[in-house]
């Protein structure tokens, strides 16, 4: 998955958008408050000649707000039969800063609840959906998985901070669970053995599986990657895992010890060209937890 430069917002460092001509556009933001907050986004784009980078604004850095942090919701039940996404045909909008803060589909259209664009469904009906993520636990202990949109319910970039509407479920050893996403959804699923640890600022750590599926602003491209940037930034454990294009060896792996193969690890904050780029109307991402 081709990715654009990171953006760092810390103290007096400004924010700038760098649109990418590659398949995926990604940025991260660090801002100074009580502690550094790590925010990372994924945004797909069709392959094209790279446009000129936008100049860094002279104004104050963009403020990335943190959503309220309620207690985690109980394990999300799996829908037993095909369930249409709420507001599936509604239009989406762009948030501020253009491509960097592209909001996409967060499920809120037509009066629907934020996060309704992501659902856990029974494995037997996965083939009824066009954008599927299957999570398989290869370890001997249960794994917690939490999925959420890149843009929070208040319209701010607050990925992987606890919030109402996130998917929160457990996968037992040897078990597979299925998450489906509506078209034009951008977000992250974090996972870890037993319980996902939190960084000192309250953000979920663990191993991140970032996804951008059926991006309607960029010709329907999809992308995904493994990222340990948050966990390694805060010195937290990095689970082993991978995300692959289903039935292929096209993967992003996180190896034991936090070493990446086509994945994001500490020191790669400014790199592009990592992860998966998929140009297909149907996407099936196969996520392995506890092995790569």
What label would you give each PLM region?
Residues 144-148, 225:
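Beta-strand signatures of extracellular beta-sandwich domains
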Residues 39-41, 144, 168-170, 176-180, ...:
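Ser/Thr- (and often Asn-) enriched beta-sheet segments in non-cytosolic proteins
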Residues 137-139, 149, 183, 230:
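Residues that form ligand- and interface-recognition hot spots within folded domains
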Residues 151-155:
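Short edge-strand/loop segments of extracellular domains
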Residues 159-190:
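Intrinsically disordered, low-complexity Pro/Gly/Ser/Thr-rich segments with frequent PxxP/GP/PP motifs
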Residues 2-130, 194-292:
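Extracellular low-complexity, O-glycosylation-prone Ser/Thr/Pro/Gly-rich "stalks"
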């Amino acid at each position: 998955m081709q990715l654009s430069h990171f953006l760092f917002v810390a103290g007096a460092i400004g924010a700038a958008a760098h649109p990418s001509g590659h398949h995926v556009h990604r940025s991260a933001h660090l801002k100074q408050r009580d502690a550094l907050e790590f925010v990372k986004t994924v945004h797909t784009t069709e392959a094209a000649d790279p446009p000129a980078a936008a100049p860094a604004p002279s104004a104050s850095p963009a403020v990335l707000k943190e959503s309220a942090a309620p207690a985690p919701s109980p394990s999300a039940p799996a829908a037993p039969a095909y369930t249409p996404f709420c507001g599936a045909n509604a239009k989406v909008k762009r948030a501020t800063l253009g491509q960097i803060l592209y909001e996409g589909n967060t499920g809120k259209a037509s009066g629907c609840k934020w996060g309704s664009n992501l659902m856990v469904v029974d494995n037997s009906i996965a083939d009824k959906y066009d954008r599927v993520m299957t999570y398989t636990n290869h370890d001997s202990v249960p794994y917690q998985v939490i999925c959420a949109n890149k843009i929070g319910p208040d319209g701010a970039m607050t990925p992987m901070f606890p919030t109402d509407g996130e998917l929160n479920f457990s996968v037992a050893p040897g078990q597979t669970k299925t998450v489906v996403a509506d078209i034009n959804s951008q977000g992250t699923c974090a996972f870890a053995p037993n319980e996902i640890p939190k960084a000192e600022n309250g953000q979920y750590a663990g191993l991140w599986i970032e996804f951008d599926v059926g991006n309607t602003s960029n010709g329907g491209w999809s992308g995904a990657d493994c990222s340990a940037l948050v966990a390694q930034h805060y010195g937290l454990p990095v689970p082993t895992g991978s995300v692959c294009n289903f039935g292929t060896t096209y993967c992003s792996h996180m190896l034991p010890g936090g070493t990446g193969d086509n994945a994001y690890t500490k020191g790669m904050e400014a790199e592009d060209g990592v992860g998966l780029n998929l140009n297909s109307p149907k996407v099936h991402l196969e996520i392995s937890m506890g092995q790569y």
